[in-house]
Structures are given as structure tokens and as C-alpha cells.
Amino acid sequence: MFKQSKLVSALAVAGIALFGASAAQAQIVKIDGSSTVYPITEAVAEEFQKAKKNAIKVTVGISGTGGGFKKFCRGEIDIANASRPILKKEMEACKEAGIEY
């Protein structure tokens, strides 16, 4: 339940941030990572999109926890699904790329 609450919070924050974007920009939240977390993320993403009347599109992919962190640290996605804590080397990759979390 706690993980789901964090995910809902993360989606809400991402949604709020995207509302500040210009109307011409596509409002998309990109999520990728753990297949373990995927079913919960997909369900929350669907409900979030319904709540926002599809004004914000949420994409959810599966590339594994490590793959999700790589994409996150490269700035390719907004949220990394993870079934484990971020590793030190992944933290360093994010820091080197200027990605803050």
C-alpha cells in the first residue's frame, strides 16, 4: 500500500508539473522499469488519466529495474519503477547527468 501511495503521489506531482507546460506541448508522463511494479503502475496510470480526462498521457513500459534507472538517469523517462533501492553507481550516473530526484 505504501509503494502504491508513493506512485500515486509521484504521478500527481508529475501531472502538476506538466500543467505548467504550454498548451502546444504534449503532456506525457513516461514511466519505465520493474516488471514487478508494472501491474500497479499501469492501474494507477489508467485511473490518473481518467481523473485528468486524458489531458495527460501516461506511458508505462517494462525494461527491468536496472533498465528503468538507466533510462531515468539519461532523462528518457520521468519516473523509474523499481523493485529495489537505487544502487550507488546509478545514483552517480544520475548525478553526472544532472538528474535530481
Task: Tell me the role of every PLM-derived stretch.
Residues 1-3, 24, 50:
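Intrinsic low-complexity, intrinsically disordered segments enriched in polar/basic residues
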Residues 1-11:
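Bacterial N-terminal signal peptides that target proteins for export
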Residues 6, 19, 31-32:
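Intrinsic disorder/low-complexity segments
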Residues 11-14, 24:
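Cleavable N-terminal signal peptides
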Residues 13-18, 41:
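Short hydrophobic/aromatic-rich motifs at helix boundaries and adjacent loops
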Residues 18-19, 49:
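A short hydrophobic/aromatic micro-motif that marks alpha-helical segments and, especially, helix-coil
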Residues 19-26:
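Sec/Tat signal peptide C-region and signal peptidase I cleavage site
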Residues 27-101:
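N-terminal segment of the mature folded domain
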